[in-house]
């Protein structure tokens, strides 16, 4: 009898691990813990120029989230604000993963807001989008009297965060955010910064095979819910490469060349160029260096530092300070 119970428990556990999105979500969350950032040679000098305000709350009282503020120490006037949504495959990651990079951006004369948001599978689509809108409402109300130029917003994201902010941009352009009016207008967003994001999710769901198919389906179930409950158009709706991007603001797009979404990023650059949206695409051939997913945070690499320099030039071209 006991042997049967043990066997049933083992079988049940294996089936749960195979069919439920929770086990793989937990594993991936652990993989993303701590981020991948490495130090730049001039880190100490850069960090000495900026200040941080950590763990400011936003959102509704029953589901509060938190954001960090990084800005120059010496500031006497309002400045453009970069709002950054972190990556983590929708199930992991943290605002602190962006802190070092945010300090470099702040040293250029920008305020950087790095937000946390509710993670899958506990919270599912479109919760992060609503939380981004909640954060922008919070910043617009400016309870903390931050020196934000709210007419010069830059939306930024890495990995899953890049997909989230690019999707949110579409709703701002249409002025229809799930039947509501977005917190901001398209005129207030001066540019998008997109790092290592997936911009065409539908093919991953419909054409992937083998172990990768199993992994993708578990992650999609974690974020969107079980496939049987997902409207057939959702994967198209969240895939930027299947949408009209002609009214997008200027975009900065980069990706690594090893086990990331470089091909999709290059296609997005081409799409934006075709519709005359100003775009800067930064990519490196594998003959130069093998650059993994989220390489931009690895500032011990010369390519990451080169990308940061190009990003600074892009921001200078598209903001007023």
Predicted regions and their residues:
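Alpha/beta-hydrolase superfamily serine-hydrolase fold, recognizing
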Residues: 2-321
